[in-house]
């Protein structure tokens, strides 16, 4: 069996995610557009689990004219993504990458923190601790904009969402490719229900607003007031 790994899809990683999650390009575009309401000069913008760095580079290109003095940091632990980082850092003087574990990152003076499908790969204990760190590191008025896969607490609804999701993925992948990925992610990804996810974020002190949903995937703006 050929197992799915993030490394094997690295060359076309963003395209792979777009084919795997219906509406991903709209989610990505929404986060990019929302960033302009929060990025501020002389603050830090952080993308947690930045993979190829596409979102960070998009935010720089969108915001640099009006907000030229913001600094952008990508956090990534998967070494297979590191290859292009030095090139990116040379091209964008506002950009740097933290090549390591998000639990070791010091969130400070942040106007915006983003994360796309990252928390779901952490242990529940680490999720809460990281969310708490993000809240403390954000400036008042800042935001944590993130998206996660959730699961329904109703088994019937969960089955509906799962099979509709598989039907969508069959437009782009074979049954074997879908199964291989599921087998691999089963041991890595442990989603929350929406209720559990919202509670973790609210317990950290955030005010939350859902701005996007497709199947069991949600996008949330969490505000530090």
Q: Over which residues does each language-model region extend?
A:
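Class I SAM-dependent methyltransferase Rossmann-like catalytic core
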Residues: 2-28, 35-37
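Class I SAM-dependent methyltransferase SAM/SAH-binding core
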Residues: 46, 52-103
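Short conserved loop adjoining the S-adenosyl-L-methionine
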Residues: 104-108
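A conserved beta-strand element that flanks and buttresses the S-adenosyl-L-methionine
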Residues: 114
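A short glycine-rich, Lys/Arg-flanked "PGG" loop and its adjoining helix->strand segment in the class I
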Residues: 128-140
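Conserved beta-strand signature within the Rossmann-like core of class I S-adenosyl-L-methionine
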Residues: 141-149
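C-terminal alpha-helical "lid/dimerization" subdomain adjacent to the S-adenosyl-L-methionine
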Residues: 149-200
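Core SAM-dependent methyltransferase catalytic element
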Residues: 204-225
């Amino acid at each position: 069996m050929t197992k799915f790994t993030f490394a094997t899809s690295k060359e076309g990683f963003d395209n792979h995610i777009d084919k795997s999650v219906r509406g991903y390009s709209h989610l990505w575009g929404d986060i990019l557009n929302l960033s302009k309401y929060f990025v501020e000069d002389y603050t830090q913008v952080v993308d947690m689990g930045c993979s190829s760095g596409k979102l960070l580079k998009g935010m720089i290109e969108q915001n640099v004219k009006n907000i030229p003095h913001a600094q952008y940091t990508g956090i990534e632990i998967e070494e297979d993504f590191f290859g292009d980082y030095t090139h990116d850092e040379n091209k964008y003087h506002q950009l740097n990458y933290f090549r390591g574990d998000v639990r070791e990152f010091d969130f400070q003076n942040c106007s915006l923190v983003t994360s796309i499908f990252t928390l779901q790969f952490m242990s529940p204990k680490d999720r809460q601790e990281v969310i708490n760190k993000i809240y403390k590191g954000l400036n008042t008025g800042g935001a944590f904009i993130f998206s996660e896969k959730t699961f329904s607490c109703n088994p019937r609804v969960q089955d509906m969402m799962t099979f509709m999701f598989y039907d969508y993925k069959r437009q782009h992948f074979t049954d074997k490719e879908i199964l291989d990925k599921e087998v691999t992610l089963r041991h890595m990804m442990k989603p929350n229900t929406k209720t559990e996810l919202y509670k973790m974020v609210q317990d950290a002190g955030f005010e939350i607003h859902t701005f996007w949903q497709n199947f069991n995937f949600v996008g949330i703006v969490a505000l530090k007031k």
